[in-house]
Amino acid sequence: NALTSEEGEQVVDGETQASTDDGSSRVVDMIVQLKDGTDTAAALASINSAVAAIYPDASAEVSREYTNAFTGFALSAPIGSMDAIRGVSGVQSAFLDHETQVSDDGDDPPADAEGTGGADASADSGSAADAESNPMAAMRAAQHGDVLSAQVMMKADKISQTGAGKVVAIIDTGVDMSHPAFSGGLHGTPAIDSSKGASLAQQVGKSGTYVSEKFPFAYDYADGDNDASPAGAHGTHVAGTAANGDQIMGIAPDAQIIVAKVARSRGGGIPDSALLAALDDMATLHPDAVNMSLGRTAGMDSDADTLFAGVYEKLQEKGITLDVAGGNEFQAGYGNKSGKNLPYASDPDSSTLGEPGSFAPVVTVASIENARNGANGNYKMSDFSSWGVSPDMRLKPEVTAPGGNIYSSVPGGGYQMMSGTSMATPQMTGASAVVLERVQNDPLFSSLNDRQKVDVVQNLIMGTAVPVVDPGQGGGAYYSPRKQGAGLANLEGATTSSVYPTVNGAADSSRPKAELGDGTNGWHFDVTLHNVSDTPATYELSSQALSENIEGGFFTGHSTDWNGKGVSVSFSGSSVTVPAKGETTVGIDIKPGNEFAQYVSANAPAGTFLDGFVRFTSRTNGQPD
């Protein structure tokens, strides 16, 4: 941004240039994306010529070059030259370098840096026999109660996987890498040793540094140096939840952590240019999972949206899982003039999903409250957790994890509570690592290639997730999938199931969700169950057909199950047996009836959502739902 001197001239990076009346010569930061195959040197020369044709004394000053996830530049130039830059041969798009913030936390309890508070959840965390057969279960059971309760909710206390040999990247505000939480030695062979870490730093063309076995690569993309020390507590808390190795244990305690600091040390803003630089490097660093607990309002800039969507797609194609916070924006009606904090029933679009959570390639994570009084199955979704769907009607979020009242590491050696989808997301980043560890090491999946093994991780996580019953509704109705996605992650199920679902014709076969679009006459979709074991598996089918309740002209955030009471859901069979080493397809038909149609017509003149779940309840011992 430009500063104005006392003489009325603009000062940009210490240089002075004549001010124009319309401000078009003001120098701004922008991102320029080039078309595939464009010669970058020739394109930059043409860009400079285009700028000079309008502002003879100006040029395009390049601060970054992108070469891996996309081709382009971060540069500074007069704002009035942007259209000319867009017109240069080989330029795909050009847009202002926006700033993002880390996802704002939800309503936090008072910080508890002393390490007190929280109930002991160990009564639900397994027997002595479990601990003897699974030493990791014993280690998890010895944790602080607030950490254990969140992990018991996800049944992470039942798993033996630790993320050994896996790498997660934390794109955030930086991490206190000297924190005792990260000081323990890793079990297993690390994916990145000091030699490979040095090689990777050379490959990405920056001076990123190998800090330790736990932190094989760290770089400050916002300020352009090796000091990835935190700007605030956020990144350290997130990293701890994903992969702490101390007694305050993360989901994947043996995973290595790449630290990509993208927030400025002053102000904490995250420039697009820094975020894109980190993402561009991920294509070379190739972590198994990337955590992005950050976001902004969706749909602010179509050129930026198109570029980011392409970058996320490119990383997914490379077998990198992107776990992203859904946002903490409640519902669309929160804070409106009604005083009810509820959306008007005149508009069914109550989505508040932000970017990048709205993009198709990412795994968008919703938040549920940590059951601090013991993980007993009676849970509550976090009010602040944003509702889907995406602007183009894709079903989001994908999955839920504990994000309300999460206890984890903060800079300076302490621990404290934080709340937000930012805190739920690293639970899933750790989950992606441990489930991938299972898939890569389990002979049952040996016939899959490397990319298929990455993809099946999300089939397993979403396929074994447990839909959360809404305690505010009664009658056993679930929260809408627009609030919770597939449900609460069940890591015991995801690390033991030998059957996984796919939805036929889905845009992404690794995401078992049926996105059926608009309509009033009904829908059909098919689900295929794939069995990789030598044992047949039998399931009984059930469903809920949910629609949000309407009271006094407002959507309430709670849903009624209309199945059999205004909506018909039928299956091609009430039970299904999946043969050993085989697959079986089940057809599902959904038909709204007159009773439901009349209710919608009377209460939601612009229409409403009909969503829900199809459940496959296992009737085979040892096989999870």
Per-segment meaning from a language model:
Residues 501-512, 533-601:
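Surface-exposed binding patches on compact interaction domains or structured appendages
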